[in-house]
Curated annotation (Swiss-Prot):
Source organism of this protein record: Prochlorococcus marinus (strain MIT 9313)
UniProt keyword Membrane present: no
Classification lineage: Bacteria, Bacillati, Cyanobacteriota, Cyanophyceae, Synechococcales
Compartments where located: Cytoplasm
HAMAP family from the UniProt entry: EF_Ts (MF_00050)
GO molecular function: translation elongation factor activity
Protein's UniProt name: Elongation factor Ts
Any single GO CC term annotated in Swiss-Prot or TrEMBL for this entry: cytoplasm
Major localization listed first in the record, in broad terms: cytoplasm
UniProt keyword list: Cytoplasm, Elongation factor, Protein biosynthesis
InterPro entries registered for this protein in UniProt: EF-Ts_dimer_sf, Transl_elong_EFTs/EF1B, Transl_elong_EFTs/EF1B_dimer, Transl_elong_Ts_CS, UBA-like_sf
Annotated segments matching region Involved in Mg(2+) ion dislocation from EF-Tu: 82-85
Classification via CDD domains: UBA_EF-Ts (cd14275)
Role played: Associates with the EF-Tu.GDP complex and induces the exchange of GDP to GTP. It remains bound to the aminoacyl-tRNA.EF-Tu.GTP complex up to the GTP hydrolysis stage on the ribosome.
Length: 218
């Protein structure tokens, strides 16, 4: 695998409009060949998706997913630029896939890392800084370890950072980019709500023998 310099990554980004990490991955997959890397990005639908990511996506649809057994349900809003695209099979398929992803990820609370409140980040930082295995380490090293741990923990809370359940080689964010590139419009996951049957309801735990005994004395 060829070494990928920062300059060639920047050149590919300028040429395609794709993100830095996507460009780096494309070049690594293409042994540093700019032409092949550009083709790789187009095949993945990433190049064109990045160029459209700043456009306003105010149309779309709200989709639902009810898991087998009807114990988990999801409402999810997915936005695009036009009503025509929102009705199309590609968009509707993405809507279903992302809603299904939410159903499969009970720990996910936010769409993107930017949505995570500062107080949540600070709380995680405080917890990690107090770990026994960090005592006695230099502050600089401790801070670096904590940063890595927090980053990993926060990713677990973010929908777009999750490996796609149908293809774990890509994240949900990469899936959205791929479909956006194929469709030719900006696509955004706006919000979601996940429901679990009986969640939050306190149930009195009475064993069967006790219940029968109480019925006899009634």
């Amino acid at each position: 695998m060829a070494d990928v310099s920062a300059k060639i990554v920047k050149d590919l980004r300028d040429k395609t409009g794709a993100g830095m990490m996507d460009c780096k991955k494309a070049l690594a997959e293409s042994d540093g060949d700019m032409v092949k890397a550009s083709e790789w990005l187009r095949q993945k639908g990433i190049a064109s998706a990045e160029k459209k990511s700043s456009r306003i996506a105010a149309e779309g649809a709200i989709g639902t997913y009810i898991h087998t057994g009807a114990r988990v349900g999801v409402l999810l809003e997915l936005n695009c630029e036009t009503d025509f695209v929102a009705r199309g099979d590609l968009f509707q398929g993405l809507l279903k896939d992302v809603a299904m992803q939410v159903a499969a990820c009970p720990n996910v609370e936010y769409v993107s890392t930017e949505e995570i409140p500062v107080d949540v980040v600070e709380k995680e930082k405080s917890i990690e800084m107090g770990r026994d295995d960090l005592s006695g380490k230099p502050e600089q090293i401790k801070a670096k370890i904590v940063e890595g741990r927090i980053g990993k923990r926060l990713k677990e809370l973010v929908l777009l950072e999750q490996p796609f359940i149908r293809d774990s080689s890509m994240t949900v964010a990469e899936l959205v980019k791929q479909v956006a590139g194929k469709i030719g419009e900006n696509i955004k996951v706006r919000r979601f709500t996940r429901y679990t049957l009986g969640e939050g309801i306190e149930v009195d735990q009475t064993d069967f023998a006790t219940e029968v005994a109480s019925m006899k004395t009634a």
